[in-house]
Regions:
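Bacterial Sec-dependent N-terminal signal peptides
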Residues: 1-37
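Extracellular/secretory-pathway and virion-surface proteins
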Residues: 24-576
Length: 576
């Protein structure tokens, strides 16, 4: 007599072969060449031979559940990619400041026939710099120094006058009473200057705080944010006899100078701070089943976080932050501190990654060893927060004062599905609706001891050829008609070993696997409605870790060969 046990053998074979895969009931690959007919009447019965499956690729059975962060690329590799929800922007500006002169008494220079000289005026100036200024090399002002010269009426005119100013003042043009003057090396020349008051306007292009001069000094006090400047205007003249009117009382030339310089640009070291609320967030929607089990440890081998920056500040910025993986209730699951990295001027790509390797041209790699912790437990979303972004105060450059400088940032998370040493992904599946078959079957009960005890079992054996770079571990348990788990003490489901991992697709690993299902009584057997399976795919079996291998949907397959189902004990069927 022959009976048919519908789907049991083929389902078990499928489940053995697809440790991280989707439900056997929902897939269309074939088990047509497996004979599922058993005979009754002996202590041991075996399924007839030649029971093999075709190669089963992951893509045949994995359901990505319309995931928006797991996809299969053109090469068949599984990829994880999440884009930030927005572009983040922060703006900095360093305020202009002024350097003003203090009132000083007018200077007088006695004149005489022939040559004469002396200090015509002294500018004493100071100002308060913005807090962002760390050091000053020079400032740009495009402002004027006004110099007044009074020539006494005891002369018709002064034949020659030259005014010398400190070399730290860059004076690019000058006028006297509106007429242009000759200027060379900060020396201004005038000829035939008539008696009376004259106003000279000296246009100051910039001030160099690193140049010394015997006609004055500059200083910058970083701690008190003060600049000070003293500039002497030194006059030399020549008066001929013919231009003297009153030889008895030649008197003197007098003068003073004033300035109110607004600084519009500066060269030096600065530390403006960009203020970001965050660098944004990435969400993980529609998590595939094989990543949703509580036992999943998604410690990826080398996750990459790509940060696209555009920094208009002409200074590189030192940036750091913290990434926090959170669950749906916004509770922190994992936190990773991001060390300081440099964002240069202009557009740049900074890639945070776990492994230490050389970056391709056009990118900068920053190694963050703990980056894999963010996905060990699959979060609802990942936030990039606690951003510190400050200009590098060791760089010397020119900045415009009162000008807005922007930094924009957008980040994405990407990595091939590659497991690190302690990583594991898991999947729970089931075979249901077994009761309509098993309730018709009974094992012969014991004639000694407990009359309800039985000595019978079903044993499934197969050779698993695995091309996946993961070790596959199966655990199983029964469920009753009420959907409750049946204790192992009543229905034991024993899997004898872990399926070995393949080191690469060209070198598959073959493991002989045995599953033994043993009910303790026929009552337990008759209450069996389903079998629950948990499959765990891990990078390590405790010793030999296989890391950094990309999981592939097309090339990495599993084949189940030499499937054998053995019944031990007398089996009684009631098919009335």
């Amino acid at each position: 007599m022959n009976i048919r046990i519908p789907n049991l053998c083929s389902a078990l074979a499928l489940l053995l072969s697809t440790g991280i895969l989707q439900s056997c009931k929902d897939n269309d690959f074939s088990f047509d060449n497996i004979d599922a007919t058993m005979g009754l009447g002996s202590e041991q019965l075996e399924l007839p031979g030649n029971n093999d499956t075709k190669e089963i690729a992951l893509d045949d059975v994995v359901n990505l559940n319309n995931s928006d962060f797991v996809y299969i690329d053109y090469n068949g590799d599984y990829q994880i990619k999440m884009d930030g929800n927005s572009q983040e922007k922060a703006t900095v500006s360093i305020d202009p400041f002024t350097i003003k002169s203090s009132p000083t008494p007018a200077k007088k220079i006695l004149i005489s026939q022939g040559d004469f000289e002396g200090k015509l005026a002294v500018l004493t100036m100071s100002g308060t710099t913005p807090a962002e200024v760390e050091d000053l090399n020079s400032v740009t002002c495009d402002q004027n120094i006004n110099v007044t010269i009074k020539v006494p009426n005891t002369v018709r005119c002064v034949d020659e006058l030259t005014l010398s100013l400190p070399s730290f003042l860059l004076i690019d043009h000058a006028t006297n009473d509106g007429a242009n003057l000759s200027i060379s090396n900060n020396t201004i020349s005038l000829n035939n200057t008539v008696a009376g008051s004259h106003t000279m306007v000296l246009h100051v292009k910039s001030i160099d705080f690193k140049t010394s001069s015997n006609l004055g000094s500059t200083s910058f006090d970083k701690n008190n944010h003060r600049v000070r400047l003293t500039a002497e205007i030194y006059l030399k003249g020549r008066l001929s006899k013919n231009n003297i009117i009153n030889r008895g009382n030649l008197s003197s030339i007098s003068g003073n100078a004033t300035a109110d310089l607004t600084i519009t640009a500066a060269t030096g070291c600065f530390h403006p701070v960009f203020t970001f609320d965050s660098f944004g967030s990435v969400a993980l929607n529609n998590i595939p089943d094989f990543l949703s089990d509580k036992s999943v440890n998604m410690n990826l081998y080398d996750p990459h976080i790509r940060l696209n920056f555009n920094n208009s500040l002409p200074i590189a910025a030192k940036v750091s932050g913290r990434m926090i993986a959170r669950d749906a209730q916004n509770h922190a699951i994992a936190t990773v501190d991001i060390p300081i990295f440099t964002v240069p001027t202009g557009k740049s790509v900074i890639v945070l990654h776990k492994q230490s390797e050389t970056a391709p041209q056009g990118q900068t790699y920053v190694t963050v060893p703990g980056l894999g912790n963010l996905l060990k437990t699959i979060p609802d979303h990942i936030d990039f927060v606690d951003i510190k972004a400050k200009a590098d105060n060791t760089q010397t450059t020119e900045v415009k004062l009162g000008h807005d400088y922007d930094m924009t940032e957008q980040y994405s998370f990407s990595t091939p599905l590659q497991l690190d040493a302690d990583a594991a992904i898991a999947y729970t599946d089931s075979i249901d609706d077994l009761n309509k078959t098993v309730k018709k079957l009974s094992f012969k009960e014991s004639t000694v001891g407990d009359p309800t005890s039985i000595d019978g079992s079903l044993e499934l054996e197969a050779d698993i050829t695995n091309r996946l770079p993961t070790y596959l571990t199966l655990t199983a348990w029964g469920t009753n008609l009420q959907g409750d788990s049946i204790p192992q003490s009543q229905l034991s489901v024993d899997v004898d070993k872990t399926v070995d991992a393949a080191s690469d697709t060209q070198t598959p690993a073959t493991t002989h696997l045995t599953i033994t299902i043993k009910p303790q009584s026929n009552d337990v057997l008759h209450s069996l409605e389903g079998l629950q399976f948990r499959f765990r795919a891990a990078a390590s079996n405790g010793n030999n870790a296989i890391v950094g291998k990309t999981i592939n949907a097309k090339k990495q397959t599993i084949t189940v060969k030499n499937i054998k189902l053995t019944k031990t004990g007398k089996l009684v069927g009631n098919f009335n």
